[in-house]
Amino acid sequence: EDELGITFEPDIDRLVARSDIISLHCPLTPETDKIINADRIAQMKGDAYIINSSRGELIDEDALIHALETGRIAGAGLDVYTHEPAVDSRLFDIPNVVLLPHLGSATFEGREASGERVITNIRVWADGHRPPDQVLEGWQ
């Protein structure tokens, strides 16, 4: 910690209250659903920013919108949204938010791997077998 100039804070409420920037990088689980809620947003510093490039449901979007509209926090950067692919239209008119179209996986390697999976699925299906990534049961 000293070498990196950081301090580990195991208590999320203290972490939220002390942080200048909160950047979410965790999976969506029952424990993390709306981990950033109205109470935690109220604890944030007025000049704090929140960044979410993980899962939209990690943030209570209504509470975040209210905090952004009222200036309760300085701003937000969002790459994911609660009801993807839809984005809450209230976010479009808020000047202190940056909205991205879920670019977190948009690396060259990620796109290449996705393309390879598509090709594999098509080949398997064309050979009369069930594609490994088939989503709809019973589809032929």
Predicted features along the sequence, with ranges:
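C-terminal helix-to-coil terminal segments
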Residues: 84-140
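Rossmann-like adenosine-cofactor binding region
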Residues: 1-90
